[in-house]
């Protein structure tokens, strides 16, 4: 019997609260230890979900069967497939962050490059899919550059006040020594809005205390959903039962191959046994009442049909309840149009849209921290005007998109028309490029019409509303001559 059937249900990770008056400006080590103790009660859940993703399922922890019995341990890694498919579909295309102020937009782009932010985002998405939530942690390096990294909820937690606003009072990043004389002892850091304190072996180290440059807790929680439930957590029991059934099916196949041959009503000598094994033939004769002799294999009743039905139903339920499409299913091959494919991915898209709202909220909080440093951004409130654009990573029917955009000509604005095309990443930049090319074409046409009369060409273009210089018209003419 699988351990999942005997497991006491655990609680989902709710926020930790405190009375801010009891904590004061900084928590004591005793208070921190108490919250670490509460946090460690959640580690069992985190470790179980992590082991599912890594492929170490309960089937491998079942008691061994007798040596003479087949004992296959087969595990299908649905959790990893579900997680990686969801992450690739929803966030394989990096989140695009933009701002109306070009200087701010350039600074954000530099921050993303320095931190390989698309990879950090993907790690946070993966952690949220596994554990239900995760943390983005900001810090300043030796060059006073802002860095960001992804933390799992196994190593970091935050404690909030018990007011309606639920402000963060302090956070703890901790671990335990794994080797040496201090094996098992706690070490880490305590973060408050004003201070960062370090501790080791159960005591705070005063000489390492430093001011918190951010003025607030420099970490932001990312949530897959409001209850912090992992993506494959609702189907963990189904997955364990699927593994158990598949393993028993493998055992049945082995048992069938090793079935015992029973000879009833006749005596078989040793030399005859060898002959039967080598020639795979049974021929009994010269025995009294030979007609009553019976030769047959001893096998247990086959439940192959029942097992197959159960496996098929479990597989359908796993994808259905996890709300992640099985893209390897044969039915996906018939989804030739974009609309048909979108319908098949409808449930997954709903989960992605819900998660997108949570991500946008977390990103805005994170960039609020980032904007608090004048070296990053000249405006502390620049995060309010940031725009976060999410795009699903899905095969596109470019001909279908182009036909739709062409048919929409005259019904919608040019910008909206261009936004219908997935291969146009920035409609505004594309419109600017189109306008620039149009002006260049008309400049060349004007010069050609006036036989090289630059002054006349400039006058015509200015009358048409274009701002061009004599030099630009001459350069365009020289390019045309060179091409000829």
Question: Where do the model's predicted regions map?
Answer:
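Extended, helix-rich architectural segments
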Residues: 1-147, 478-484
């Amino acid at each position: 019997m699988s351990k999942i059937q005997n497991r006491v249900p655990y609680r989902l990770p709710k926020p930790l609260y405190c009375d801010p008056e009891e904590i004061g400006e900084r928590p004591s080590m005793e208070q921190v230890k108490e919250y670490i103790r509460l946090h460690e009660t959640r580690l069992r859940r985190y470790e179980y979900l992590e082991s599912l993703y890594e492929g170490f399922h309960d089937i491998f922890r079942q008691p061994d069967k007798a040596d003479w019995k087949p004992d296959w341990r087969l595990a299908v890694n649905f959790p990893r497939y579900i997680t990686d498919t969801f992450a690739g579909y929803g966030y394989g295309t990096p989140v695009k962050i933009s701002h109306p102020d070009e200087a701010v937009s350039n600074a954000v782009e530099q921050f993303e490059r320095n931190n390989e932010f698309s990879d950090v985002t993907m790690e946070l998405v993966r952690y949220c899919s596994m554990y239900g939530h995760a943390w983005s942690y900001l810090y300043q390096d030796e060059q006073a550059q802002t860095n960001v990294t992804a933390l799992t909820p196994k190593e970091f937690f935050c404690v909030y006040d018990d007011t309606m606003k639920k402000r963060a009072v302090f956070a703890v990043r901790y671990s335990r020594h794994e080797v040496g004389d201090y094996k098992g002892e706690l070490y880490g850091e305590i973060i408050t809005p004003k201070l960062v304190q370090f501790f080791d072996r159960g005591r705070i180290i005063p000489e390492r205390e430093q001011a918190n440059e951010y003025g607030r807790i420099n970490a932001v929680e990312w949530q897959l959903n409001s209850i912090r439930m992992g993506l494959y957590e609702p189907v963990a029991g189904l997955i364990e039962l699927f593994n158990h059934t598949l393993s028993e099916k493998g055992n049945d196949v082995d048992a069938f191959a090793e079935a015992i041959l029973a000879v009833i009503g006749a005596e078989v000598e040793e030399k005859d046994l060898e002959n039967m094994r080598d020639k795979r033939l049974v021929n009994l004769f010269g025995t009294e009442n030979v007609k009553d002799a019976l030769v047959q294999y001893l096998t247990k009743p086959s439940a192959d049909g029942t097992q197959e039905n159960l496996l098929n139903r479990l597989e359908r339920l796993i994808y259905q309840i996890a709300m992640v499409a099985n893209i390897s299913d044969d039915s996906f091959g018939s989804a030739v149009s974009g609309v048909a494919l979108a319908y098949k991915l409808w449930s997954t898209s709903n989960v992605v849209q819900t998660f997108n709202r949570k991500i946008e909220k977390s990103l805005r909080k994170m960039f609020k921290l980032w904007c608090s440093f004048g070296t990053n951004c000249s405006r502390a409130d620049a995060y309010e005007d940031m725009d976060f654009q999410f795009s699903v990573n899905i095969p596109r029917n470019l001909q279908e998109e182009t036909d739709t955009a062409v048919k929409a000509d005259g019904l919608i604005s040019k910008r909206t028309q261009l936004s219908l095309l997935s291969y146009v990443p920035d409609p505004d930049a594309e419109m600017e490029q189109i306008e620039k090319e149009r002006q260049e074409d008309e400049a060349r046409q004007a010069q050609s019409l006036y036989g090289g009369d630059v002054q006349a060409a400039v006058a015509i273009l200015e009358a048409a509303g274009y701002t061009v210089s004599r030099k630009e018209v001459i350069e365009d003419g020289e390019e045309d001559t060179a091409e000829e």
